[in-house]
Amino acid sequence: MPFLQRTDKKDITIQEILYHQSGLPSWIPFYQEAIDKDSYDGRLFSARKDVHHPVQIGTTTWANPKFKFKSEYISPVKTGDYTVQICDSLWLNRSFRKVIEEKIAEAPLKQKRYVYSDVGFILLGMLVEQLAGMPMEAYLQREFYEPMGLEHTGYLPLRRLCQIGNCPFQQRPFL
């Protein structure tokens, strides 16, 4: 990947990523870059419910719903460069991909041992798109789902599966 060529990640192999032995971090909280840290008091998340964290989003995680997104990255409507759908009323600016690339490039590489890594699979997705010359969802649809006759399997369910009434994740008390 061109954005990794001048980093400590330039020699990571596909095998290392697939085996989760690349040294990449398990995850990177990219979403933090899209949130306006001045829009809420205290911390965004808490281990317990309190006046600032009334919304439970995990077994032991409570959230402050009063935050705002940075308008340079998030829009409530699809318009211009805001083309990446997050949910029915949130659209991400295409420029956020640069933020993701920068965060991956900056993330310190650790010892090459087994650590499950979402970051590796984000990189693999980017690599597939680069090599195929098309978005991941189009590639998967053409090369996997259609040839196998899979009608209820897909990538980016808001674009395809929800149109046929298969949206198990529609309840969103936090977003």
Region spans (language model):
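Acidic catalytic motifs of isoprenoid enzymes
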Residues: L4
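Short, surface-exposed loop or secondary-structure junction motifs
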Residues: T7-L175
